[in-house]
Design a protein with these regions (language model features):
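Signature of N6-adenine DNA methyltransferases within the class I
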Residues: 1-172
Length: 172
């Protein structure tokens, strides 16, 4: 559940789960499961996997969430990149999800990325679900030039639909 849809009680869960660790106020609720899972793995010889909306491995979530998991010496064992998940509910509540497994660092078994029905062995799976080193790109805090105003919301469709063009407007 995205941060804007969370109840007061759900927002309070973040301070309980994160404890003294700093966290972003815009994290999806599923972030708590990843933190709890990493905490558990760091104290045991366990592994887990979650299905989560793909927003968990995009944008600010990566810089706000995954450094906490890395400090617990937890790594990704396998990952399924984004795919559409539908159900039989009225109105078919389809969402785009990923599957992500976490395990203690140093396990000798292979790591795999599954994408489009293809399994690829990986040296390392980073939080962008790529076979690449663990890097975290932070959100820039200032415009790239003083000629541009600061961006308040980034990529957030909050214009009331006014930026949609019909075919005639597009051709014009």
């Amino acid at each position: 559940m995205g941060s804007s849809m969370q109840t007061k009680e759900q927002k309070e869960d973040f301070s309980i789960v994160f404890g003294k660790r700093k966290y972003g106020k815009n994290l999806d609720y599923v972030s708590l499961w990843f933190i709890k899972g990493a905490d558990y793995i760091s104290r045991s010889n366990s592994q887990l996997a979650f299905v989560a909306t793909n927003s968990i491995v995009q944008g600010l979530h990566i810089s706000m969430l995954f450094p906490h998991i890395l400090t617990e010496h937890v790594e990704i064992g396998y990952a399924y990149t984004s795919f559409k998940w539908t159900n039989n509910a009225k109105g078919n509540a389809g969402v785009t999800v990923i599957v992500l497994s976490l395990r203690p660092e140093g396990i000798k078994s292979p790591k795999y990325i599954f994408s489009g029905g293809v399994r690829t062995e990986a040296k390392n799976i980073n939080w962008y679900l790529l076979d690449s080193p663990n890097i975290v790109l932070d959100s820039p805090r200032h415009p790239i030039s003083n000629e541009f105003p600061p961006m308040v919301y980034g990529n957030k469709p909050s214009d009331g639909g006014n930026l949609f063009l019909d075919i005639l407007e597009y051709q014009d």
